[in-house]
Curated annotation (Swiss-Prot):
This is Porphobilinogen deaminase. GO terms for cellular component: cytoplasm. It catalyses: 4 porphobilinogen + H2O = hydroxymethylbilane + 4 NH4(+). Monomer. Binds 1 dipyrromethane group covalently. It comes from Francisella philomiragia subsp. philomiragia (strain ATCC 25017 / CCUG 19701 / FSC 153 / O#319-036). Belongs to the HMBS family. The keyword Transferase applies. The gene is hemC. It comes from the Bacteria. Gene3D superfamilies: Periplasmic binding protein-like II, Porphobilinogen deaminase, C-terminal domain. Its cofactor is dipyrromethane. Tetrapolymerization of the monopyrrole PBG into the hydroxymethylbilane pre-uroporphyrinogen in several discrete steps.
Length: 300
């Protein structure tokens, strides 16, 4: 194999992720790479929340079409943007080492969530973040915030918001660590499924590519991601519901913490389970939470 063409979105963060994968393929597999950038519907439609326009798949469809049309061999994604069910014919071939999975509190005026005054305006379009923030601080005003990292930071700097919530991983990768005012504890805001993990998507019939890319796979990331995604799949969660899940691996034991919440944050259910089989663990925890009324909470 002489070359691999990688499909990527055009944002700085997407290109950082793609170049990271490109460098690893070239250095570790000794295969030349070319990047094919493109805009997705998720990048173009910025005036509506994701849950109103079709969900996370809007960040992937154009990249998948490029693979089907032989204009790319693989695509690179942030795992938190990947739906629990891929279109037929596609698979996730490699999981990269996880960056800090926590949410980041970013503000020019306040040092932490606790420091925000009553009625402060916080920007996020994530139902998961909104629900958990309102559960912790019901007196805050949450307003939608879409766009790439730089666009969101500009809106904060222009005074549109008192604070915004972003993924720490994205800020760290873009060397914008100094913008992080507070790493939000997972006890306050449980991360999105797969947050902090970069993945490679490929056609499942591309056996030669899949075999080579397997060498890049981080087994720890694959393990925790499998648990989190199994939980999400059992609940059939997407960006239209407030669901969070975070798995930690210690001595071959996985501890999975998960939560579901009503969109207003008034009702929240959080549980934790430990086991050694990630797929089974995710399903068991989801089933336990369903029995405790998870679906009723998500419908509110």
């Amino acid at each position: 194999m002489k070359q691999i063409v990688i499909a990527s979105r055009e944002s700085k963060l997407a290109l950082w992720q793609t170049n990271y994968v490109k460098d690893r393929i070239q250095q570790e597999l000794n295969i030349r790479c070319q990047i094919n950038t493109m805009k997705t519907q998720g990048d173009i439609i910025l005036d509506k929340p994701l849950n109103k326009i079709g969900g996370k798949a809007l960040f992937m469809k154009e990249l998948e079409i490029a693979m089907l049309n032989n204009k790319a061999d693989i695509a690179v994604h942030s795992l938190k943007d990947v739906p629990y069910q891929l279109p037929q014919g596609f698979c996730l071939s490699s999981f990269m080492p996880r960056e800090d999975p926590r949410d980041a509190f970013v503000s020019n005026k306040y040092s932490s969530i606790d420091d925000l005054p009553r009625g402060a305006i916080v920007g996020t379009s994530s139902l998961r973040r909104k629900a958990q923030l309102l559960h912790y601080r019901y007196d805050l005003e949450i307003r939608d915030l879409r766009g790439n990292v730089q666009t969101r930071l500009s809106k904060l700097d222009n005074g549109d918001y008192d604070a915004i919530i972003l993924a720490s991983a994205g800020l760290i990768r873009l060397e914008l660590n100094e913008r992080i005012t507070q790493f939000i504890p997972v006890e306050i805001s449980l991360p999105a499924v797969g947050q902090g993990i970069v993945v490679i998507e490929a056609l499942d019939k591309s056996s030669e590519i899949l075999q080579k890319l397997q060498k890049l796979n981080c087994s720890d990331s694959f393990c925790v991601a499998t648990a989190e995604r199994a939980f999400n799949q059992e609940l059939k969660g997407g960006c239209h519901v407030a669901i969070g899940a975070y798995a930690e691996l210690h001595d071959n034991q996985i501890t999975l913490t998960a939560m579901v919440a009503s969109s207003d944050g008034k009702n929240i259910l959080k549980r934790k389970l430990t086991g050694d089989d990630p797929m089974r663990l995710g399903k068991l925890l989801a089933q336990e939470m369903i029995e405790l009324g998870a679906y009723k909470i998500l419908e509110k």
